[in-house]
Amino acid sequence: MKNILSIQSHVVYGYAGNKSATFPMQLLGIDVWALNTVQFSNHTQYGKWTGMVIPKEQIGEIVQGIDNIGELHQCDAVLSGYIGSAEQVEEIIKAFHKIKERNPKAIYLCDPVMGHPDKGCVVADGVKEGLIKIAMAQADIITPNLVELRELSGLAVENFEQAIEAVKVILSKGPKKVLVKHLSRVGKNAAQFEMLLANNDGIWHISRPLHNFNKEPVGVGDLTAGLFLANLLNGKSDVEAFEHTANTVNDVMETTHNAGVYELQTIAAREWIVNPKSQYKAVKIG
């Protein structure tokens, strides 16, 4: 069994961060070590929430605690998502380095959550800069959305061709794999939900249906990053993991849409997480 240290947010009500990613990864046979960067009543896109940011020291203390009992070498990967403070970025990288000392084969997936003010997604000052200046170069895999793709690459990215250039720029900065979670308005077809995968062997594009919600569910990116990493650890190739992830997320979104609710319906879609009914295929474009 593979083990992932998943360092991201926790919400008591609803689905975002670890709450969105942990159960699907467990369904895929992964033992998830969930370390929460914040504990909130609900996700920030409700516009109001209660809770706290976990003190930055706790990240290192908890990782050290696992090391103290001699089990840190079992960690196969680190996944970071929503980060509660700029200081936490450095602590996460320190934690990854300690894990690499115990298991040189361990990998790091950075889901570079930078916030989206238009959607009400709020992150602390300095987090974006830490992700760009510190985390990106350390990550084996990085999973930006369109906003984050622009920030990480330093390019405007106003069309599909520029998105291709942006992923190439990011590959040159350290990551070995770039998964663009949603191309949004720079995709080929505005009526589809489109994603990109890039590695040193090429670039792949996949399209699936775009489900229209009155209020777009939160936690989809967290689900996407977790599924992709879990699939890789389970031995799938990059493209196989990409396809399984896109198809699973589509099935979760369809289940959520059919239920007519705001929060992701990962439990209701559990069957499709293991064996997705969608069968969309990635196309190599570069």
Swiss-Prot record:
Pathway: Cofactor metabolism; pyridoxal 5'-phosphate salvage; pyridoxal 5'-phosphate from pyridoxal: step 1/1
Binding-site positions, substrate: 9, 44-45, 222
Its EC number(s): 2.7.1.35
One GO-annotated biological process of the protein: pyridoxal 5'-phosphate salvage
Keywords: ATP-binding, Kinase, Magnesium, Nucleotide-binding, Transferase
GO molecular function: ATP binding; magnesium ion binding; pyridoxal kinase activity
GO cellular component entries: cytosol
The protein's required cofactors: Mg(2+)
Catalytic reaction list: pyridoxal + ATP = pyridoxal 5'-phosphate + ADP + H(+)
Keyword Secreted part of the UniProt annotation: no
Binding annotation for ATP: 111, 148, 181
UniProt subunit comment: Homodimer.
Family statement: Belongs to the pyridoxine kinase family. PdxY subfamily.
Task performed by this protein: Pyridoxal kinase involved in the salvage pathway of pyridoxal 5'-phosphate (PLP). Catalyzes the phosphorylation of pyridoxal to PLP.
Protein name, entry field: Pyridoxal kinase PdxY
Organismal lineage: Bacteria, Pseudomonadati, Pseudomonadota, Gammaproteobacteria, Pasteurellales
Gene (name only): pdxY
